[in-house]
């Protein structure tokens, strides 16, 4: 789509009453020019234009342009500070940039605004584990597991955190639970859990009886 056509599309959308749909969904496709045209179109203001920044930020995040994504999410949060998904999206960009403290703070904010979804707890657990805070990571994973008990990846990641703490029995229980969940689109997760179980079995010391004196 040409840069001339994009603004024309936005104007046409306004004319036929599709402006809100265009703004809210401009990030669904890899067309950042549409989001940029929405941002530059003066009738859009306030929380509505935040969707355009959010959409362009998500496009940048999908393509690994984390700094661009963070800049757009900053603008979106400034315009719509009570939208939990914006903090979660920015947290993902921070985490991928290695800014774990900022990522954890944003996951905390996303959870404070909307504590029901499991994913922010899971992703916060990943950031905490990467930072070495295994106790808090396990707590965060545990909430994710409670909210989404069929999420095999959350159980695998909690098992890995238990394993890193030397809690082999707890780790084994999570790996076994991940494998036992109903089949879905998580074959790689199950394979990883099986591999970890095999490692644990191989690492178990052979029980040798010592004769009593």
For each of these PLM feature ranges, what is it?
Residues 54, 61, 88, 94-95, ...:
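Position-specific recognition of the canonical hydrophobic site in helix A of tetratricopeptide repeat
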Residues 55, 89, 123, 157, ...:
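Canonical tetratricopeptide repeat
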Residues 46, 50, 84-85, 118-119, ...:
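Helix-start (N-cap) detector for alpha-helical repeat units in TPR-like alpha-solenoids
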